[in-house]
Structures are given as structure tokens and as C-alpha cells.
A protein has these predicted regions:
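Extended catalytic-interface subdomain
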Residues: 45-47, 53-60, 66-68
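Non-catalytic accessory segments flanking enzyme active sites
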Residues: 86-185
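Short loop/turn segments that connect beta-strands within the blades of beta-propeller domains
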Residues: 4, 14, 51, 59-61, ...
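Short loop/turn segments immediately following beta-strands, especially the blade-tip
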Residues: 13-18, 67-75, 126-128, 171-175
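Surface-exposed loop and turn segments in beta-propeller and other repeat-based domains
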Residues: 18-41, 75-98, 182-185
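Hydrophobic beta-strand positions that form the internal "hydrophobic ladder"
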Residues: 1, 54-55, 107, 154
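Short loop/turn segments immediately following the C-termini of beta-strands
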Residues: 3-5, 60, 68, 111-114, ...
């Protein structure tokens, strides 16, 4: 089985060149815990920045900006915070019509803490290398997130082994003070 595919490459149809774009990321971009006899699966891609200026890829913990031409070094957009805190950050696409990610805009992230298994949400600025701003990190599972089209309002489910899945509403990324709008049992 092939075992040498360990990153991302870009094919330039105008020149016929293939460029390995993730080799300079100092950490694996594939699931290093995978122990079944098949090609290793990548952690995934968050998306492209506007104008195909960069591809955002994941390692086990963090989000990296990679130059599709391979001319500049990859930048860890989460500033290594995931690896430092043993947390996984992943981009949540909240606009179904989004084609690319606009640099400078706020990105909503899911957070998973490998140490204590807490989940939550964080935000970061697209294209800027800074530690994500944790909005909520708790012992619940957060799912079914939906964003209002023209407002900074989110609806989502929150549940754990002791509480049924209820719908909560958060305004202006204030997930810590979200309002519970259902009462499931």
C-alpha cells in the first residue's frame, strides 16, 4: 500500500507542475494514530482564502495557512495554541453559500480538549496568526450549529449524559450566556 503520501500538493495546469505545499509544516497533516493497513487519512482542509491566496489545512491540533505556490513558509494561524493546550481547533462553515474565506473576517471554530474531553467554540481572525479566543469550553457536546443569515446569532444543541439535547441561542458569540429555548426530557 502507498505510504509516501503524507501531505498536500497543488497541480498548476498552466505549467504542468506539481508543488508539495505542506512539506514545510513541522507536524503531520495526516492521522498519525491510524493503525489500519491503508493510506493514512488527512486531518482535512478548512478551505481556501479569497483569490486562492492560501489553503487552510489541519494538523492534529491546529490550522495552518499554506501558500499554493509553495514559495512562502506555512503559518500556524492558531499560533500553536492547539498543540500547547492539547486542544483540536476546526473551522465551522456557518454560511452555506461561502465559496472562500475572506482574510480579516471572524471564523468560528469547534474546540475539543483531548485532556479532559470538553467541547466548545472559539473564534479567530482569518489569515491572522493569533491564539483562538475560547467562547465556551464545557462538558457538553455541542452540535447542530446554525447561524442567522444577517445577524450574529447562533442556534445549537447542547447535551451530555445527564442532560437531554436542548436548543440554545447565543447572540454575538456569547456562548457562555446563551439562552435555553427548549426543555427536552
Amino acid at each position: 500500500l502507498p505510504s509516501d503520501i503524507t501531505g498536500y500538493s497543488v497541480y498548476n495546469s498552466a505549467t504542468g507542475e506539481t508543488v508539495e505545499i505542506s512539506d514545510a509544516i513541522p507536524y503531520p497533516t495526516w492521522d498519525e494514530d491510524q493503525d489500519i493497513p491503508m493510506m493514512r487519512q488527512p486531518y482535512g482542509v478548512a478551505g481556501w482564502l479569497d483569490g486562492d491566496k492560501a489553503l487552510l489545512v489541519y494538523d492534529r491540533y491546529d490550522i495552518w495557512s499554506v501558500d499554493p505556490a509553495g514559495k512562502t513558509k506555512p503559518v500556524c494561524l492558531t499560533a500553536g495554541e492547539g498543540r500547547k493546550t492539547n486542544r483540536r481547533f476546526r473551522y465551522i462553515k456557518t454560511d452555506s453559500e461561502e465559496i472562500s474565506i475572506t482574510p480579516g473576517r471572524e471564523m468560528l471554530l469547534s474546540v475539543f480538549d483531548y485532556t479532559d474531553k470538553r467541547n466548545g467554540y472559539a473564534t479567530m481572525t482569518a489569515g491572522k496568526a493569533t491564539a483562538p479566543d475560547i467562547k465556551v469550553l464545557d462538558t457538553y457536546t455541542f452540535s447542530q450549529l446554525r447561524k442567522a443569515k444577517n445577524a450574529n446569532v447562533y442556534a445549537y444543541q447542547r447535551a451530555n449524559f445527564n442532560t437531554s439535547p436542548d436548543v440554545w441561542i447565543a447572540q454575538n458569540n456569547n456562548f457562555r450566556n446563551a439562552a435555553k429555548v427548549t426543555d427536552a426530557n
